[in-house]
């Protein structure tokens, strides 16, 4: 059974055991009251006294309907969760001498990733003396970005970091309707790396 974290999160009415509180709410004169008077004001309106800021001095309490108060909290939490952006980054690796077959294979996967709403981090890995081909690697990544211009925009132009030259692409359109993106994480694309990679020294 799921636990309702919102329930019993706030002390209400008789459970509030302090000498005085700062009162807020609709149809009440805001200010500091002793706890008995604050409870009386809430009861006179057939509402609850809800402690919303226990660490304040004095604690802040709201005169409100507790059930509606909890409902609004849940609604707000649900809306915030729906608005949260979950970014998935797929990695695609090339060698400086990648052939057309391998290139097209990875291009196809990149299009699929972008259509799903994922970002694509493509990089050329230079092994040994293949670093001499860094200009060729840059040309390859720019060609990759150009071939994906209908699906993505360049977020980061090719940069060389150690033995890697990387470009970052972000999708132009939102995720496919009905697609539920996985949790935020950086995922290496195993499928895109299964093909043979030509990395000449």
From Swiss-Prot:
Gene field: infC
Role played: IF-3 binds to the 30S ribosomal subunit and shifts the equilibrium between 70S ribosomes and their 50S and 30S subunits in favor of the free subunits, thus enhancing the availability of 30S subunits on which protein synthesis initiation begins.
Subunit structure, as described in the record: Monomer.
Protein name: Translation initiation factor IF-3
Key words of the record: Cytoplasm, Initiation factor, Protein biosynthesis
A Pfam family recorded for this sequence: IF3_N
Gene3D superfamilies the UniProt entry points to: Translation initiation factor 3 (IF-3), C-terminal domain (3.30.110.10), Translation initiation factor 3 (IF-3), N-terminal domain (3.10.20.80)
GO terms of biological process kind: ribosome disassembly
Entry superkingdom: Bacteria
Recorded family membership: Belongs to the IF-3 family.
InterPro entries: T_IF-3_C_sf, T_IF-3_N_sf, Translation_initiation_fac_3, Translation_initiation_fac_3_C, Translation_initiation_fac_3_N
GO molecular function, one term: ribosome binding
The species this protein was found in: Porphyromonas gingivalis (strain ATCC BAA-308 / W83)
Residue segments, region Disordered: 170-201
Gene Ontology terms: cellular component: cytosol; membrane
SUPFAM superfamilies, A to Z: Translation initiation factor IF3, C-terminal domain (SSF55200), Translation initiation factor IF3, N-terminal domain (SSF54364)
Biased composition (Polar residues): 182-195
Cellular compartment(s): Cytoplasm
């Amino acid at each position: 059974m799921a636990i309702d974290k919102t329930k019993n999160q706030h002390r209400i009415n008789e459970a509030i055991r302090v000498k005085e509180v700062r009162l807020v709410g609709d149809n009440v004169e805001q200010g500091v009251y002793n706890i008995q008077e604050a409870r009386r004001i809430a009861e006179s309106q057939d509402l609850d006294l809800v402690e919303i800021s226990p660490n304040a001095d004095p604690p802040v309490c709201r005169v409100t309907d507790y059930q509606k108060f909890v409902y609004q909290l849940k609604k707000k939490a649900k809306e915030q969760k729906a608005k949260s952006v979950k970014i998935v980054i797929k990695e695609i690796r090339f060698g400086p001498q990648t052939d057309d077959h391998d290139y097209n294979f990875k291009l196809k996967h990149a299009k699929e990733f972008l259509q799903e709403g994922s970002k694509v981090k493509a990089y050329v890995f230079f092994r040994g003396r293949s670093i001499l081909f860094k200009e060729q690697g840059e040309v390859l990544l720019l060609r990759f970005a150009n071939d994906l211009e209908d699906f993505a925009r360049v977020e980061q132009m090719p940069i060389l970091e150690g033995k890697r030259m990387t470009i970052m692409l972000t999708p132009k359109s939102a995720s496919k309707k009905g697609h539920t993106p996985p949790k935020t994480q950086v995922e290496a694309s195993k499928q895109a790396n299964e093909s043979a990679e030509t990395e000449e020294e």
